[in-house]
Design a protein with these regions (language model features):
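Thiamine diphosphate
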Residues: 232, 253-276, 280-283, 495-503
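Catalytic phosphate/nucleotide-handling subdomain of diverse soluble enzymes
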Residues: 462-524, 539
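Short acidic, glycine/serine/threonine-rich loops at helix termini
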Residues: 74-79, 120-123, 222, 231-233, ...
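Conserved catalytic cysteine-centered active-site region
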Residues: 96-98, 241-249, 273-284, 288-291
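Glycine-rich loop/linker segments at domain edges
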Residues: 6, 12-15, 82-85, 161-208, ...
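Flexible, low-hydrophobicity surface segments
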Residues: 1-162, 274
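C-terminal catalytic domains of large/alpha subunits in multi-subunit enzymes
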Residues: 67-68, 239-244, 274-279, 308, ...
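Helix-loop-helix junctions that connect adjacent transmembrane helices in secondary transporters/permeases
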Residues: 147-238, 403-481, 612, 683-704
Length: 763
């Protein structure tokens, strides 16, 4: 292959590293209204009265909107970026009289500059009727205090939601008699695991610009992963036709799933639609930390049974998920906690997976890389590590006995067959990379410090099977270069580059001959968006099909110009020539000119793709840590990982994806945590308080690949974006156990907890 599986530099790399104006606030007109939000100081309250009289008199203030400007009995909407009909309940109004978390919107203020808007915000007088909040998600279900008592709450999909029980979703599934299987096992691991909410903490906060175009339509430029879903959400929130809304995105300064939720779009859209003036909102870091869409807090009760020789016979999982004040992504994230962990163990005779998603008066949760699989894998993989210890077996050897193989029907994976898998090779590779044989389980350095290793494995999906759609349009221009128009969003992942590589491979042209445009709801073909590890696998396949179709058109027109049958010509990327007489040829530019100026057929193709399968990528990771038993400090000295993502379209970008995801997983394991005070107020409102690790905090990160070939993906590719975050959680927690002899069932694992446990063990 000429371009696929080659380490090309990102197309936008030079512009980004040299600081060119490419992000939203760089490219929009600066003469626009500044929009800011007055937020609730209470976790649960009704706005009794709100007085904006003095605030409206501040010079420069254009408008102030409150709940009185929004019909409270109107149909509600969701901010979740999901294919219609959304699984997430429609439970929001633009401004609701009932505020449900500290940070919920009370008023929208728009003015000519930040100074006047900030002044007006301070002059708004609000009287609240403070209500008892639901702050403990363990007691939320069937609590007499309802987070959503309203009658216009609506669930479009049968996900087991019931707002009168504080239930955002409930589900049960299984196969076999799990209780009988566990009763017959030699060993049963039975524990409850708890993962906290954590923030995506992307460098570019939420931001949106809105204006009215010549035709009276609402134009939205937003840092979003989901232009088409955002368009629908905005139209639903404003109760206007979808045809009156256009959404486009500039370069995105990171998302990690946060921008799969339309967190900021509705507010300037509301202002612009009402005032007919352009406006923008840029979330502060405080707002992005305290009023955004963090990972769902989850608690997982795992019962895992095995024979004495290490064969896993059954897995019983109950997950309780905290969706917070609103239900964005609640019903779908919880599903992945089981459906992306249980299938790893293909020899299991029975499984049961039950889940509840509950409303509380915490910040609304959302999508974050890993999307529920991260939480479930921590629980299941930690249980497997404990099983290996109890059986005195090597954790790698135990997994090699149990892992799902290519051709297996995967348990808890909707009856799907494992169509491609190199998980066994990944296990062997990582064991060698970390030098497991010589380092496992631990080495006491004799100075209060212990070095130890631990491991875990993971899977994810490649798009949402049978639901999400990828599309691409390709057209040949008059001088022989191509325009690739997509609806997927490059949020720093490099998908513009990888999709161009796929097109260039099919069309036999240099990568620089592919110009990529998107995403824009008016000009791009429909695409569900960049989430669910779908872009390379789903939109990439659409791009491959589209390029094949355009190639056929080029050959057909070239043959027509040559006066011979289409099956008698070949195309080498530069010329169409007769197979039997290569000297008889037409250049690509000649064919393009004939198409455009010769009034012949347009050389343009559009293809759409959705896959009936979501083939899992796999990953194995191993960590070496150094634990100071006196202070509890943990240093990650080395993290080695091996990924099966099918064919890596761009190995360099794939490796960078893996390294970044591993760093996020390390942060979730050791430092990152969204906490609240006793009144429900978030406590980490800055990057000084919310501690995300940087590259210099971690030692060596080594990533290798063991490639399978996925016949349903473009050139054999599967996804890479999310699976990479999942292995640090079980690997590091197991390494800490091997160092001090205490298992931790809750994340993050803090130095205080480690030091106290180590001291207790040495009494």
């Amino acid at each position: 292959m000429n371009t696929v599986n080659k380490p090309f530099r990102k197309k936008d790399a030079m512009q980004l590293v040299t600081g060119q104006p490419v992000y939203m606030d760089d490219v929009i007109p600066q003469d626009c209204l500044i929009v800011k939000l007055l937020r609730s100081p209470h976790a649960n309250a009704m706005v009794r009265t709100i007085n904006t009289t003095v605030a409206k008199k501040v010079p420069g203030i254009e408008a102030i909107f409150t709940w009185e400007d929004v019909p409270q009995d109107a149909p509600r909407y969701t901010q979740a970026g999901q294919t219609f009909p959304e699984a997430s309940p429609r439970d929001r109004l633009v401004i609701d009289r009932h505020v449900r978390f500290v940070g919920d919107v009370v008023a929208i203020v728009a003015g000519k500059d930040e100074k006047c808007v900030d002044k007006a915000l301070k002059l708004i007088k609000v009287e609240y009727q403070v209500l008892e909040p639901v702050l403990d998600f363990h007691t939320a279900k069937d609590n007499p205090v309802l987070v959503h008592p309203e009658d216009n709450w609506e669930a479009l999909c049968p996900v087991g939601a019931d707002n009168k029980r504080n239930l955002c979703a409930h589900d049960e599934c299984g196969s076999g008699d799990i209780d009988a299987v566990l009763a017959g096992c030699d060993v049963v691991i039975d524990h409850v695991y708890h993962t906290k909410a954590c923030q995506q903490a992307m460098m570019e906060t939420f931001r949106t610009y809105c204006s009215i175009d010549t035709y009276g339509r609402l134009n939205v430029l937003s840092s979003t992963q989901i232009v088409f879903h955002a368009r629908r959400n905005i139209a639903n929130a404003l109760h206007i036709p979808t045809s009156m809304v256009r959404v486009a995105k500039p370069r995105i300064g990171g998302g990690f799933g946060a921008k799969q939720t339309a967190v900021s779009e509705v507010y300037p859209a509301f202002v612009t639609w009402k005032t007919k003036k352009p406006s923008k909102i840029i979330f502060s870091r405080v707002e992005s930390q305290t009023a955004s869409s963090p990972r769902h807090e989850m608690e997982m009760h795992v019962r895992l049974g095995a024979t004495k020789d290490g064969i896993v016979k059954g897995i019983d999982l109950y997950t309780l998920s905290n969706t917070g004040a609103y239900g964005e992504h609640g019903p779908t994230t919880v599903g992945l906690s089981g459906h992306k962990s249980i299938p790893l163990y293909g020899k299991a005779e029975a499984f049961r997976f039950v889940s509840d998603v509950v409303y509380t008066n915490h910040m609304s949760a959302g999508a974050y890389r890993g999307y529920g699989a991260t939480q479930g894998l921590f629980a299941v993989e930690s249980a497997v590590n404990e099983l290996a210890h109890k059986l005195n077996m090597d954790p790698f050897a135990l997994r090699l006995k149990n892992t799902v193989q290519e051709g297996d029907v995967m348990p808890a994976y909707y009856g799907a067959v494992n169509t491609s898998c190199a998980l066994d090779r990944c296990l062997v590779k990582v064991r060698e990379m970390i030098d497991w044989e010589h380092k496992y389980p631990a080495r006491d350095l004799g100075n209060g410090k212990v070095r130890a290793v631990g491991m875990g494995m993971a899977m994810q999906g490649s798009g949402i099977s049978g639901m999400d759609v990828g599309s691409a349009t390709l057209k040949l221009n008059d001088d022989g270069f191509y325009s690739l128009i997509i609806g997927a969003a490059d949020m720093g992942t490099g998908c513009d580059t990888t999709l161009a590589q796929i097109a260039a491979e099919v069309l036999d042209c240099p990568l620089d001959n592919i110009a990529v445009f998107g995403a824009d709801t008016d000009t791009s073909p429909y695409d569900s968006g960049s989430y669910a590890s779908s872009t390379t696998y789903v939109t990439g396949k659409a791009t491959e099909k589209c390029a094949m179709k355009l190639r056929e058109q080029i050959c057909k027109l070239g043959a027509e110009l040559l006066g011979c049958p289409a099956d008698a010509v070949e195309f080498d990327g530069k010329e169409v020539f007769e197979s039997a007489a290569p000297e008889t040829k037409k250049t690509l530019s000649e064919i393009a000119y004939a198409s455009q100026f010769g009034h012949m057929v347009p050389l343009e193709a559009t293809e759409t793709h959705t896959s009936p399968l979501s083939p899992p990528p796999y990953m194995v990771g191993a960590a070496e840590v150094e634990v100071d038993t006196e202070t509890g400090e943990v240093k990650v000295l080395e993290f080695d990982a091996c990924v099966d993502c099918g064919t890596p379209i761009n190995p360099n970008l794939t490796r960078v994806q893996a390294e970044g995801g591993l760093l996020q997983g390390i942060g979730m394991t050791l430092t990152e945590n969204v906490t609240y005070d006793r009144k429900g107020c978030p406590e980490e409102n800055s990057l000084f308080q919310y501690k995300i690790p940087t590259r210099i905090d971690i030692g060596k990160i080594n990533v290798e690949f063991e490639n399978s070939y996925e016949s349903n993906g473009p050139f054999g590719a599967k996804s890479i974006g999310e699976v990479v975050i999942n292995t640090p959680l079980p690997a590091i927690s197991d390494a800490i156990y091997n160092a001090i002899g205490t298992r931790f069932y809750e994340l993050p694992i803090t130095p205080e907890q480690i030091a106290m446990a180590a001291a207790e063990n040495h009494k």
